[in-house]
Amino acid sequence: MSDNRTLLTDMAAGLFADLAGKPFDVAWPQVAEAGFSTLLVPEDAGGFGGDWADVLAVLRLAGLNALVAPLAEPVIAHWLLAGAGIAAPEGLISIAAPGQRVPYGRHATAVVHVEGGMLSLYHADACTFDEALSPAGEPWDAVSFTGAAAAWAACDVDLLALGAFARVASASGALEAAFTLAIDHVNTRVQFGRALAKFQAVQQAMAEFSEEAAAVDASAAACAAALDYGHASFEIAAAKLRMGIAVDRAVPIAHRMHGAIGFTIEYALNHLTRRLMGWRSEFGGDAFWAERLGRRVAGLGGHGLWREMSARTDRIVG
């Protein structure tokens, strides 16, 4: 565990709360200035020297506040470059996993691409972006590498899995924020002479919402612990799939509890739920991770699965 996590989360919580609702051109410069991009870079290389649990804590806060700025992508990019011994260029560095779009690609000064055991760093002038938007209205651009890589190195990191973990971490915060909004609404909204929260059907729905949010929290924590241990492919596959299930169940509940107000652009809920629905598909959707997890489980067999689960849990918690 990082000794500076309390300081880190206090700083992130205050900054992200101040930036909630602010556009990219306001939010990103402040996020960059705070130095979050070097969260995983060792201290002797000029970074924070944090671990994946630190990353989880920060990404969770970003999701909680619906931060309109890339955070996971530059953190992962700087970590990969530091591990490869490649100097990171100035500005926003995003990532390109195989077959995936590039978050905030049009604003990036460089893109880190990992495929076939090779990491490549491309400057923006070697990239062509086909601009598009995510369901939350954020840049989600297709990239073509039309120029030569500025640097490259061998790399066996599963970039798609790291991106998937990042989305689970952010979703854990967004689900908490959506749950809080829903709780506040049903406690204050009066219908038929009493608060909505007094109705049994509402209570049951909110209990289910709470269960889904807790499941994503636990999945994200397991991923971070496994990443710090060094082997997280199983946990990430399970967590990304579980996140998809949670979004499928929790988002409709959040909107049912609010009624029409939840869909208005001025209200905070849709800024959370649109992100959640987009993150469900980014860095591999439900079908992709279900297949990857299923193949892994089938290969282990019944008794083998139990032994594997027990061993992984012992390594992470022990």
Range-by-range predicted roles:
Residues M1-N65, F165-G318:
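Alpha-helical interface subdomain recognition
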